[in-house]
Curated annotation (Swiss-Prot):
This is Probable calcium-binding protein CML46. GO terms for biological process: negative regulation of defense response to bacterium. Keywords: Calcium, Metal-binding, Repeat. The keyword Calcium applies. PROSITE patterns: EF_HAND_1, EF_HAND_2. It comes from Arabidopsis thaliana.
């Protein structure tokens, strides 16, 4: 063997041993990466199989809920149409008179101010949210102020609450407490201006 051959043989042998050392060091790293990749792909495959079994159930539930909402919309529209088609009976003069009488208002049946029939639209317009006029507030005050002394005292309040069927009106002490909370002059009664302030704070 010549020197060149010997040198190349030694170089080859040393490079071969270096390769073996580096491959023996990299094998555990590649094995670990391989293990995690295989585990990950198995997990993805299992998850895909698992969820694919339940996907038709999810789609079915979605279809059922969409169908139910469409049926509900359809039924609502049918009921709305039936309601529109019914004759609008509204309120008759006697019904309005009964309500006015229970509130202590004049109920002269011969009064032409009361119509013979009120449609449901007219009744709903009565309850639209709008700011009451001063005259309407005065009329409301007069409902409470039966003795027309210009004040609402606990007895006046109790009378109206009892007529309206509210249980708070059954106890006179409850009525006194309510009056005290709005009584600016601390005399145990509310005057018209206090009533106006109450209405402004609560309804305007």
């Amino acid at each position: 063997m010549t020197e060149n051959q010997l040198y190349s043989f030694i170089t080859m042998k040393s490079s071969l041993s270096k390769c073996k050392q580096s491959s023996s060091l990299s094998f555990p790293l590649f094995g670990l990466i391989n293990f995690f990749l295989i585990g990950f792909f198995r997990w993805v495959s299992f998850a895909q199989l698992f969820f694919s079994r339940f996907w038709p159930l999810v789609q079915h539930q979605q279809c059922v809920s969409e169908k139910k909402s469409k049926d509900l919309e359809f039924q609502t529209s049918i009921k709305h149409e039936e309601y529109r088609d019914d004759d609008d009976d509204g309120l008759c003069r006697e019904d309005v008179g009964m309500v006015m009488k229970s509130l202590g208002l004049s109920t002269d049946q011969e009064n032409e101010g009361l119509q013979k029939q009120y449609s449901s639209k007219e009744v709903s317009n009565l309850f639209e949210e709008k700011e009451p006029s001063l005259e309407e507030v005065k009329q409301a005050f007069d409902v409470f102020d039966e003795n027309r002394d210009g004040f609402i005292d606990p007895i006046d309040l109790q009378r109206v609450l009892t007529i309206l069927g509210l249980k708070q009106g059954s106890n006179l002490e409850n009525c006194r407490r309510m009056i005290r909370s709005f009584d600016g002059s601390k005399d145990g009664r509310i005057d018209f201006y206090g009533f106006v302030k109450f209405m402004e704070n609560n309804f305007c």
